[in-house]
Amino acid sequence: AKDRRQRQMCIRDSFYILKEEIVKSLNLTLGVVEKRQTLPILSNVLIEVDESSLKLTATDLESEISTTSTISNFNSGGKTTAPARKLSDLCRLLPDMAEIHFFLDGDNLKIESGSGKYNLSTLPSDDFPVFEFEDSQGQINISSENLKTIIMKTSFAMGNQDWRHYLN
């Protein structure tokens, strides 16, 4: 009961976002979403809302990606998780330029757009593994062109079907 109450309070009210905004963000995160389902939470995307933005985070415990999108009609912030692929498929099927309304109702993320109403089950956001980043003193900046060139020059050494992901 306590766990359910915590989830209900995570996103108290609601927010709106354009279809194109959330589809773009979801497409970027899907590449990292766990496909093998070793832990159910890894097939979910972490949804964090503040006064003007929606942050989506996905991880497979080796990599993590976060995207930020602009929202409208914000009422209050919070966070929850929802199945990434189902959310992406649902949003992609909505009409172009549709404004999508998201709100939490108990353990369900409710999604409304036009006359369509949809429900997705959620998992507690506290269960979602998030990487802790250290101070970025060793950070470097590199242009996308230079990074692409470096990867192309070393890609010959990658294994094609090696199950040891750290070697690829």
Question: What is the predicted function of each stretch?
Answer:
Residues 12-168:
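Structural preference for solvent-exposed beta-strand-turn elements
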Residues 1-11:
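Single conserved hydrophobic/aromatic residue that forms the stacking wall/gate
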